[in-house]
Amino acid sequence: MPKEEVLEFPGVVTELLPNAMFRVKLENEHEIIAHTAGRMRKNRIRVLTGDKVLVEMTPYDLTKGRITYRFK
């Protein structure tokens, strides 16, 4: 099965939510709820309020996403 087309957007973490979820404001002013990718969890990369992140989303649900990268 081919991998689905994913959309990537840069954003800023605005709020930390329970269960390792984050509220992220994208550059196009949309707010979504995102969780960290498994690789970030495994390597214990911390994400805090105000961090610039890269969010990966599926075209089917544009309200949820996965944080795949934290910019330095």
Swiss-Prot record:
Coiled coil feature spans: none
PROSITE patterns in the record: S1_IF1_TYPE (PS50832)
SUPFAM superfamilies according to UniProt: Nucleic acid-binding proteins (SSF50249)
Subcellular location: Cytoplasm
InterPro entries registered for this protein in UniProt: NA-bd_OB-fold (IPR012340), RNA-binding_domain_S1_IF1 (IPR006196), S1_domain (IPR003029), TIF_IF1 (IPR004368)
Subunit organization: Component of the 30S ribosomal translation pre-initiation complex which assembles on the 30S ribosome in the order IF-2 and IF-3, IF-1 and N-formylmethionyl-tRNA(fMet); mRNA recruitment can occur at any time during PIC assembly.
PANTHER family: TRANSLATION INITIATION FACTOR IF-1, CHLOROPLASTIC (PTHR33370:SF1)
Protein name, entry field: Translation initiation factor IF-1
